[in-house]
Amino acid sequence: MADKELKFLVVDDFSTMRRIVRNLLKELGFNNVEEAEDGVDALNKLQAGGFGFIISDWNMPNMDGLELLKTIRADSAMSALPVLMVTAEAKKENIIAAAQAGASGYVVKPFTAATLEEKLNKIFEKLGM
């Protein structure tokens, strides 16, 4: 099981969704969670360092989740960070685009705590966390 001190960054322009994800993470024992409202805000926080996992929405103003993902993967300092996309984009082409851009996992909204836990555990297992 992953380190409970792992620092998460939850990126979503909808504050209620950020709060839902934060609360689900808390239920799973992860209390070290920060929030960002779009990709630009997220990058500013990520460049300060210290994060171990990103959970990001797709559709956001300024910089969407896919652009954020591509930017993270192109930056050698952040490229290994796991990124879980949590989005209403359920179309096959969106899921393929996220996978090709390097998403560690993909969850379609709405989702349950069990679904989030299952995806996180798969990513932790794959990365040996």
UniProtKB/Swiss-Prot annotation:
Subcellular location: Cytoplasm
Effect of K109R: Abolishes function, decreased autophosphatase activity
Cofactor binding comment, as recorded: Binds 1 Mg(2+) ion per subunit.
Record has Metal-binding as a keyword: yes
Domain Response regulatory: 7-124
Modifications the protein undergoes after translation, according to the UniProt entry: Phosphorylated by CheA or acetylated by acetyl-CoA synthetase, depending on which acetate metabolism pathway is available. Dephosphorylated (inactivated) by CheZ.
PROSITE patterns: RESPONSE_REGULATORY
GO biological process: archaeal or bacterial-type flagellum-dependent cell motility; chemotaxis; phosphorelay signal transduction system
InterPro entries: CheY-like_superfamily, Sig_transdc_resp-reg_receiver, ST_Response_Regulator
Residue list for modification N6-acetyllysine: K92, K109
Annotated Gene Ontology cellular component terms: cytoplasm
Molecular function GO labels: metal ion binding
Cofactor entry: Mg(2+)
Modification 4-aspartylphosphate, positions: D57
Binding sites annotated in the UniProt record for Mg(2+): D12, D13, D57, N59
Alphabetic keyword roster: Acetylation, Chemotaxis, Cytoplasm, Flagellar rotation, Magnesium, Metal-binding, Phosphoprotein, Two-component regulatory system
Keyword Glycoprotein listed: no
UniProt function note: Involved in the transmission of sensory signals from the chemoreceptors to the flagellar motors. In its active (phosphorylated or acetylated) form, CheY exhibits enhanced binding to a switch component, FliM, at the flagellar motor which induces a change from counterclockwise to clockwise flagellar rotation. Shows autophosphatase activity which is enhanced by CheZ.
Subunit structure comment from the entry: Interacts (phosphorylated CheY) with CheZ (via C-terminus).
Protein's UniProt name: Chemotaxis protein CheY
Organism: Salmonella typhimurium (strain LT2 / SGSC1412 / ATCC 700720)
